[in-house]
Regions:
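Tubulin/FtsZ superfamily GTPase core signature
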Residues: 1-247
Length: 247
């Protein structure tokens, strides 16, 4: 089961909140923030790592790099993560998360055996311009970081409730990491999943029931179309350029 190879890092309040959901499903997790007020909202969370000397970053993502760089204990813990696949989750529009996730990914990518999967929770169109600029800059920095695998872009406009979006994200990734179903026809094994996570580019998941509303079997075309349908992920280009599809 791929889950045994997974560690989760949550950066900033948004990233911590999602990572805490994985913690409840018994994934090894690291929750990093510099705001005592933010941390107090995660009642019962374990392994909360505090950016000492920084009680909030006032929306300035450039401060997050300095905050993380000056907290050697946190950097050491990150560099010592044993799991092969590390999922790093942060808000693209925030300060702590968007400012620190490129450095975290860069540190982890120093180990060529690691598979680094950034998850960026992207701001809505009606949010302040600074948040959208933060999201653009962090996405650009992540794309330019050597050794990074697939990137997951979450569309915070997909549902009115952020809690619903977070819940769906946790459910879908957990299903991907834990599914060990098999058949005589074909198997989607852990090595193939790992390859998908290791390849650079946008990563999306679509989940369909066994039967559609007309009680007809779901076709391969249905499955492929669902990848570009409305879901919690940012829309991908419908240009036919795909590296891997796992069904």
């Amino acid at each position: 089961m791929l889950k045994r190879e997974i560690a989760i890092i949550g950066l900033g309040l948004a990233g911590q909140t999602v990572a805490y959901g994985f913690q409840k499903k018994n994934y090894p997790t690291y929750l990093i923030n510099g705001s005592a007020q933010d941390n107090s909202t995660l009642s019962g969370a374990k392994n909360v790592l505090v950016l000492d000397g920084y009680d909030g970053l006032a929306g300035q993502r450039e401060f997050a790099y300095e905050a993380l760089k000056n907290n050697k204990t946190i950097l050491q813990k990150i560099s010592q993560i044993e799991q092969k696949i590390v999922v790093c989750i942060a808000s693209g529009g925030g300060s702590t998360g968007s400012g620190s996730i490129p450095l975290i990914c860069d540190i982890l990518a120093a180990d060529p055996e690691k598979v680094i999967v950034p998850v960026l929770l992207m701001p809505r169109k009606d949010e302040p311009i600074q948040k959208r600029l933060n999201a653009y800059n962090v996405a650009k920095e992540i794309s330019e970081t050597e050794g990074i695998g697939a990137t997951i872009f979450i569309n915070n406009e997909s549902y009115d409730s952020l809690q619903q979006i977070n819940s769906r994200l946790i459910c879908m990734l957990d299903a991907f990491f834990t599914d060990n179903s098999h058949s005589l026809g074909a198997n989607f094994d852990d090595s193939e999943k790992e390859k998908m996570l290791k390849d650079k580019g946008a990563f999306v998941i679509a989940m369909l029931s066994n039967n559609n509303t007309d009680n007809q079997a779901v076709s391969t075309e249905d499955m492929i179309q669902s990848l570009t349908a409305k879901n919690i992920f940012l829309p991908i280009n419908n240009d036919g350029v795909v590296s891997n599809i796992g069904i």
